Amino acid sequence: MSSEAKMVDISQKETVLREAEAEGFIKLKNDTIKRIIENEIEKGNVITVAKTAGIMAAKKTSELLPLCHLIPLENVDIDIKIENSGIRVRSKVKAHYKTGVEMEALVATSISLLTIWDMVKKYEKDENGKYPYTMIDDIKVIDKIKEKD
């Protein structure tokens, strides 16, 4: 085995439907959640911007992760749910291709969560400018489907 980085050769693999779903959670202050629900965030509609950012990020995965293949995505769906202690993001990605789309789903979820943090950081800081309560957690692939060859 080489210590050199190299992209996996997928040229001999069949093109089939690939789907992946990932999710993650951002813990927020109750006041921030209330502001999001009431659309009182200075930067705009948090849910809309986070969904848009996640979709854009999924399409850029191969530019961010050097050994990922450039996959022609057919659908990216971002579902964002406000919960008691924060926001859950779930991303589902589909493509007909030779390799899976789980990294695209993870990137979509991660960037959606980071976008939420960016948009609400003003409200999450404590008196010292720190974020003792805010936390992104539990990012994982929750489903992966590969159509039979």
From Swiss-Prot:
Q: Which Pfam families match?
A: MoaC
- Which residues of this UniProt protein bind substrate? L67, C68, H69, M103, E104
Please give the Gene Ontology molecular function terms for this protein.
Answer: cyclic pyranopterin monophosphate synthase activity
- Name the Gene3D superfamilies for this protein: Molybdopterin cofactor biosynthesis C (MoaC) domain (3.30.70.640)
Record-listed E.C. numbers: 4.6.1.17
Asked if the keyword Lyase belongs to this entry, the reply reads yes
What positions does UniProt annotate as the active site of this protein?
Answer: D118
Q: Which UniProt keywords apply?
A: Lyase, Molybdenum cofactor biosynthesis
- Top EC class per UniProt? lyase
Q: Which reaction does it catalyse?
A: (8S)-3',8-cyclo-7,8-dihydroguanosine 5'-triphosphate = cyclic pyranopterin phosphate + diphosphate
Q: Which GO terms describe its biological process?
A: Mo-molybdopterin cofactor biosynthetic process
Q: Which InterPro entries match?
A: Mo_CF_biosynth-C_arc (IPR023047), MoaC (IPR023045), MoaC_sf (IPR036522), MoCo_biosynth_MoaA/MoaC (IPR050105), Mopterin_CF_biosynth-C_dom (IPR002820)
Q: In which pathway does it act?
A: Cofactor biosynthesis; molybdopterin biosynthesis
Mind telling me which NCBIfam families this protein's record contains?
moaC, PRK12343.1
What exactly does this protein do? Catalyzes the conversion of (8S)-3',8-cyclo-7,8-dihydroguanosine 5'-triphosphate to cyclic pyranopterin monophosphate (cPMP).
Q: How does it assemble?
A: Homohexamer; trimer of dimers.
The similarity annotation says:
Belongs to the MoaC family.
Quote the protein name from its UniProt record: Probable cyclic pyranopterin monophosphate synthase
Native species of this protein?
Saccharolobus solfataricus (strain ATCC 35092 / DSM 1617 / JCM 11322 / P2)
